[in-house]
Amino acid sequence: MAKNKGVRIVVTLECTECRSSTEKRSQGVSRYTTEKNRRNTTERLELKKFCPHDNKMTIHKEIK
């Protein structure tokens, strides 16, 4: 029997400040992986997480 596709999916969160920074201080882009419930959270996920490149808490948005 085939298994159904689960409701929970793995998404990647990327730092918005590292991605849009124009200065060369940032050596990379901070990324986190997490799971979200497809039925309860249909829009893109936005969480405040620690960015080691900026050394502060920043907003991380879901990417494709």
Swiss-Prot record:
Gene3D superfamilies: Ribosomal protein L33. GO terms for biological process: translation. PROSITE patterns: RIBOSOMAL_L33. GO terms for cellular component: cytoplasm; ribonucleoprotein complex; ribosome. The keyword Ribonucleoprotein applies. InterPro entries: Ribosomal_bL33, Ribosomal_bL33_CS, Ribosomal_bL33_sf, Ribosomal_zn-bd. Coiled coil: none annotated. Pfam families: Ribosomal_L33 (PF00471). One of its GO terms (molecular function) is structural constituent of ribosome. Keywords: Ribonucleoprotein, Ribosomal protein. Belongs to the bacterial ribosomal protein bL33 family. NCBIfam families: PRK00504.1 (NF001764), PRK00595.1 (NF001860), rpmG_bact (TIGR01023). This is Large ribosomal subunit protein bL33. The gene is rpmG.
